[in-house]
C-alpha cells in the first residue's frame, strides 16, 4: 500500500515539475526531506495547479514571470482569489484525464457550474464542498478510484446525470436519495453489495445501470421508481427479485443476465411496457405462467438456464420478435409457440428436443431458426411453411431424412446439417444447398 502511495506521489511530483519547473530544478523528491505533513500539503497544491492550468486563462496566468518563480505553496495560496475573480460564472468544466488525485475544495467557488467532467483521473474521494455546486446538472466521475461518496452529494438538487462507472464503491450514502432531479444514474463496474432503501426516493430516475457489481438482493423500495424505463443488473449475485419489481410500470428494458436467479415473481406480469427481458445465464428451472401477460415484449433472452419446459402462456407474447432458449434442458415445445406471429429469431440450440410441433409452421415471420445439438430424429413437413426463413441450423441431431418441403423455403440461404445420420436428402435440396 505504501509503495502504491509512493508511485502516485511520484507521478504527481513529475507533473508538478512541469508546472513549476524552477522550484524543482536540481531537486529530487528524496532531497526535499518529505514528511507526511508536507506530502499532504504538496499533494493538495500540486492538484490545485493541475486544476488551475485547465481553467480558462489559468495556464497563461501561471506562465507569467512574476508567478512562475513562486513556490508551489505560494501559488496554492493565490488559487482561491484567482478563481473568485476569473471563474465564478463558469458553467462547464472538463477536467477529464487531468492527472488529479485530489479534487481541491475550491471547486465550490464555481457556483454556476452546470456540467463537471472528472472522468479518467485517480480520485479516491470527493471533498464535502462538492455539495455546494447547487446548479450542477451533469457530473462525470467514471474511471476513478472512488471508494465512497460524501453525504453532501445529496445536496446537488439540480443533478440530472451522475456517472460513477468503473470505480471502487462498496456502498452508497443514504443521501443519494436526496437528488430529486436525477434521471440517469450509472454505477457499472463497482463493488456494491447492496443499495440503500433511499434509492426509491429518486422519483424522476429513468435509467439505472448496475452491471458488474456484487449485489445479492434489491431493496423493496426499488418498486418506487415510477419513471424508470431501463434497469441493468447484469453480472451480479442476485438470487431473487422482490415482488415490488412489478411496480416499475414504465420499465421497458430489464437486463438480469449472469445472476443466480432460480425463479421469477408472479408480479412480473405487471410490467406492461416491457420490451426486452434478458435472463440469460441464470438458474431458472421454470417460468411463471404470468410471463404471458407481458403484452409488449419483443425480446426474451433465456439462454443458459435449466428450463425443462415452457408454459403454454408463452404463446400470448404477440409482439415477440426474438426468443433465445439456447443451452437449456427442453425436451419439447408447446403447440402454442406457433402463435408467436411476429417472431423472427428462435434460438433452441443445445437442448434435448426430440421433435418439433407441427405448429412451428405458423411462424410466418421467422427468419432465423437454431436447432443444433438436440436429439431431433425428424422434422415436421410444416417447416416448409416458414416462407421468410433465411437461416436454419440443424447440426448434431439424429436426423436420418429431411422433408421435401424444405425445398419450398425460397428465402433460405443457409442450411447446416453437419453430424446427422442423414440417409435420404431430396435431390432438389441437395443441389440447391450443395450438400
Question: What residue ranges belong to the model's regions?
Answer:
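The feature captures the LRR N-terminal capping module
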Residues: 1-105, 115, 124, 128, ...
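Short, solvent-exposed loop/edge-beta patches enriched in aromatic
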Residues: 110-111
Amino acid at each position: 500500500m505504501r509503495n502504491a502511495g509512493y508511485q502516485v506521489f511520484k507521478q504527481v511530483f513529475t507533473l508538478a515539475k512541469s508546472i513549476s519547473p524552477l522550484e524543482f530544478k536540481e531537486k529530487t523528491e528524496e532531497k526535499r526531506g518529505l514528511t507526511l505533513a508536507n506530502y499532504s500539503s504538496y499533494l493538495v497544491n500540486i492538484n490545485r495547479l493541475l486544476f488551475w492550468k485547465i481553467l480558462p486563462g489559468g495556464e497563461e496566468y501561471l506562465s507569467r514571470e512574476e508567478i512562475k518563480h513562486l513556490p508551489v505553496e505560494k501559488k496554492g495560496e493565490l488559487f482561491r482569489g484567482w478563481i473568485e475573480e476569473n471563474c465564478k460564472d463558469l458553467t462547464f468544466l472538463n477536467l477529464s484525464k487531468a492527472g488529479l488525485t485530489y479534487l481541491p475544495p475550491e471547486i465550490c467557488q464555481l457556483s454556476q457550474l452546470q456540467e463537471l467532467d472528472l472522468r479518467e483521473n485517480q480520485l479516491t474521494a470527493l471533498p464535502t464542498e462538492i455539495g455546494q455546486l447547487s446548479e450542477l446538472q451533469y457530473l462525470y466521475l467514471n474511471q476513478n478510484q472512488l471508494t465512497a461518496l460524501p453525504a453532501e452529494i445529496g445536496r446537488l438538487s439540480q443533478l440530472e446525470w451522475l456517472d460513477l462507472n468503473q470505480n471502487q464503491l462498496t456502498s452508497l450514502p443514504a443521501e443519494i436519495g436526496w437528488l430529486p432531479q436525477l434521471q440517469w444514474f450509472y454505477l457499472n463496474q463497482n463493488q456494491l453489495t447492496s443499495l440503500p432503501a433511499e434509492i426509491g426516493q429518486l422519483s424522476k430516475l429513468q435509467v439505472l445501470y448496475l452491471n458488474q457489481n456484487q449485489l445479492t438482493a434489491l431493496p423493496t423500495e426499488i418498486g418506487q421508481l415510477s419513471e424508470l424505463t431501463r434497469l441493468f443488473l447484469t453480472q451480479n449475485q442476485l438470487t431473487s427479485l422482490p415482488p415490488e419489481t412489478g411496480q416499475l410500470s414504465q420499465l421497458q428494458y430489464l437486463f438480469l443476465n449472469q445472476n443466480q436467479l432460480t425463479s421469477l415473481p408472479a408480479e412480473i406480469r405487471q410490467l406492461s411496457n416491457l420490451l426486452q427481458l434478458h435472463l440469460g445465464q441464470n438458474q431458472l428451472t421454470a417460468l411463471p405462467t404470468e410471463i404471458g401477460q407481458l403484452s409488449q415484449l419483443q425480446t426474451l433472452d433465456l439462454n443458459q438456464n435449466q428450463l425443462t419446459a415452457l408454459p403454454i402462456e408463452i404463446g400470448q407474447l404477440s409482439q415477440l420478435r426474438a426468443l433465445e432458449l439456447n443451452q437449456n434442458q427442453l425436451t419439447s415445445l408447446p403447440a402454442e409457440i406457433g402463435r408467436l406471429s411476429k417472431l423472427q429469431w428462435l434460438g433452441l440450440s443445445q437442448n434435448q428436443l426430440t421433435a418439433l410441433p407441427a405448429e412451428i409452421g405458423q411462424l410466418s415471420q421467422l427468419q432465423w431458426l437454431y436447432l443444433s445439438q438436440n436429439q431431433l430424429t425428424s422434422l415436421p413437413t410444416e417447416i416448409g411453411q416458414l416462407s421468410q426463413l433465411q437461416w436454419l441450423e440443424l447440426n448434431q441431431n439424429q436426423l436420418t431424412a429431411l422433408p421435401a418441403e424444405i425445398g419450398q423455403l425460397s428465402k433460405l440461404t443457409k442450411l447446416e446439417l453437419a453430424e446427422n445420420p442423414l440417409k435420404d436428402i431430396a435431390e432438389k435440396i441437395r443441389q440447391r444447398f450443395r450438400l
